[in-house]
UniProtKB/Swiss-Prot annotation:
This is L(+)-tartrate dehydratase subunit beta. InterPro entries: Fe-S_hydro-lyase_TtdB-typ_cat (IPR004647), Fe-S_hydroAse_TtdB_cat_sf (IPR036660). The active site is at 37. It comes from Shigella boydii serotype 4 (strain Sb227). The keyword Lyase applies. It catalyses: (2R,3R)-tartrate = oxaloacetate + H2O. Its EC number is 4.2.1.32. Keywords: Lyase.
C-alpha cells in the first residue's frame, strides 16, 4: 500500500517513516533552490509564502503560460547538497516538513530534520517530464525577478513521487550510511584485485 503524505504535514505524520521508505506527496510543493535559501538565511528576507507543514523541491522548472495560467513542462531535482549550509536553519525558520531533491544531504540537515521533525527525500533523477505530469496546477508564483528556475512556483501535486526517504526524523541518513558500507566492502575487494594485477605498473 502506498504511503501518501498530505499537506499540511504534522510531526506525528513522520514519526514512523524511516530511511529507505518510499512515499508520495499530495498537496503543496514549492520549488525552492539556491537563491531562495540565501535570501532567507543570509539576507533575512522573509519568504512570501507560508511553508509551514508544506514541502519544498530543490528544482529549477521549465514552465509555460497557457491562457491566464502557468503550466509545468519539466521539473527535475537539482543537487540538494548545494543547500546543505542553509537547510537546518531553513527548516527551523519555515516549518517546512518535506525537502525534496537529488542526492543526499549532510549532518546539518540531519540535525535539522531530527530536531524540527522533517524529512529529506530523493526524487529519481532523469524523470523531470514525469514529475511535471504529477503537478496538477501551479497556484502561485513569487520572486519572478529571479528568473524562471529560481522563482518560487507554488504547485499542487497528487501522489507526487516516488520519493525515497534519505534522512528521517530520527537522525538516520541513508546516503551517509551507504557510503560507509560501500567503503567497508570496497577495501577487501580492492586488495584482492591488486593481488591478481600486481604485475601492472
Amino acid at each position: 500500500m502506498k504511503k501518501i503524505l498530505t499537506t499540511p504535514i504534522k510531526a506525528e505524520d513522520l514519526q514512523d517513516i524511516r530511511v529507505g521508505d518510499v512515499i508520495y506527496l499530495t498537496g503543496t510543493l514549492v520549488t525552492c533552490r539556491d537563491v531562495c535559501h540565501r535570501r532567507l538565511i543570509e539576507l533575512k528576507r522573509p519568504i512570501p509564502y507560508d511553508l509551514n507543514g508544506k514541502a519544498i523541491f530543490h528544482a529549477g522548472p521549465i514552465v509555460r503560460k497557457n491562457g491566464d495560467k502557468w503550466e509545468m513542462v519539466s521539473v527535475g531535482p537539482t543537487t540538494s547538497m548545494r543547500m546543505e549550509s542553509f537547510e537546518r536553519e531553513f527548516i527551523e525558520q519555515t516549518g517546512v516538513k518535506l525537502v525534496v531533491g537529488k542526492g543526499g544531504m549532510g549532518p546539518l540537515t540531519e540535525e535539522g530534520c531530527q530536531k524540527f521533525k522533517a524529512l529529506h527525500v530523493i526524487f529519481p533523477a532523469g524523470c523531470a517530464v514525469l514529475a511535471a505530469t504529477q503537478v496538477e496546477e501551479i497556484e502561485e508564483v513569487h520572486w519572478t525577478e529571479l528568473g524562471m528556475p529560481e522563482s518560487l512556483w507554488v504547485c499542487r501535486g497528487k501522489e507526487f513521487g516516488p520519493l525515497i526517504v534519505s534522512i528521517d526524523t530520527h537522525g538516520n541518513n541513508l546516503i551517509a550510511e551507504n557510503k560507509k558500507l560501500f567503503a567497508e566492502r570496497r577495501d577487501p575487494i580492492v586488495e584482492e584485485i591488486c593481488e591478481h594485477v600486481h604485475y601492472i605498473k
